[in-house]
UniProtKB/Swiss-Prot annotation:
One of its GO terms (biological process) is alanyl-tRNA aminoacylation. It is found in: Cytoplasm. Its EC number is 6.1.1.7. It catalyses: tRNA(Ala) + L-alanine + ATP = L-alanyl-tRNA(Ala) + AMP + diphosphate. This is Alanine--tRNA ligase. Belongs to the class-II aminoacyl-tRNA synthetase family. It holds the Pfam family tRNA-synt_2c. PANTHER family: ALANINE--TRNA LIGASE, CYTOPLASMIC (PTHR11777:SF9), ALANYL-TRNA SYNTHETASE (PTHR11777). Binds 1 zinc ion per subunit. Consists of three domains; the N-terminal catalytic domain, the editing domain and the C-terminal C-Ala domain. The editing domain removes incorrectly charged amino acids, while the C-Ala domain, along with tRNA(Ala), serves as a bridge to cooperatively bring together the editing and aminoacylation centers thus stimulating deacylation of misacylated tRNAs.
Length: 201
């Protein structure tokens, strides 16, 4: 991959081939959402779908959402310039299922994307799961062949997603790549986690 355009097109094309509707990025200033100054995540344009207030013509979607994070729950502003991975503006690539598939299919799609679509070396990958989510840990072993040392259990909000104080929520899983010993930092959940060695994507 030679750059961001290749990454974006590989991601969107992969999910389109797997039955997802490509949905354009919504505006940076959300329409009809007084809770946000800026769109800060890919799911923002689907809030009403997740809560059952709106129905779309598709049950799976993929996006490359333009996002700004300068305050609130997802404030990256304080980390800009201190890490190699924090910016205020970025594109969030996402895939969404609205009652179509669940955890097993999501993990399988993610694994095939990173190992076949992006051709990342399997031996350098590891995942995090919410500490109480045995199902996800079992699925990562089954689908990716991971041993326990490649599955890091996190008990904090880092692996429990919630839309807000109320509403949709649940455990999540993240994939990390080890960038090598020449990059400072420790694996997720360690005291050295804030380094850039283990990059989440």
């Amino acid at each position: 991959m030679s750059g961001v355009n290749d990454i974006r097109s590989t991601f969107l094309d992969y999910f389109k081939k797997n039955g997802h509707e490509i949905v354009p990025s919504s505006p940076l200033v959300p329409r009809n959402d007084p809770t946000l100054m800026f769109t800060n995540a890919g799911m923002v344009q689907f809030k009403n779908v997740f809560t059952g207030l709106e129905k779309r013509s598709y049950s799976t979607a993929t996006t490359s959402q333009k996002c700004v994070r300068v305050g609130g729950k997802h404030n990256d502003l304080d980390n800009v310039g201190y890490t190699a991975r924090h910016l205020t503006f970025f594109e969030m690539l996402g895939n969404f299922s609205f009652g179509d598939y669940f955890k097993e299919n999501a993990i399988e799609l993610a694994w095939k994307l990173v190992t076949e679509g992006f051709d990342l070396p399997k031996h350098r990958l590891l995942v995090t799961v919410y500490s109480e989510d045995e199902e996800a840990a079992t699925l990562w072993k089954k689908i990716a062949g991971f041993s326990d040392d490649k599955i890091i259990r996190i008990s904090t909000s880092d692996n429990f997603w919630q839309m807000g104080d109320t509403g949709p929520c649940g455990p999540c899983s993240e994939i990390f790549i080890d960038q090598g010993e020449n990059v400072w930092g420790g694996p997720p959940g360690s005291p050295e986690e804030d380094g850039d060695r283990f990059l989440e994507f």
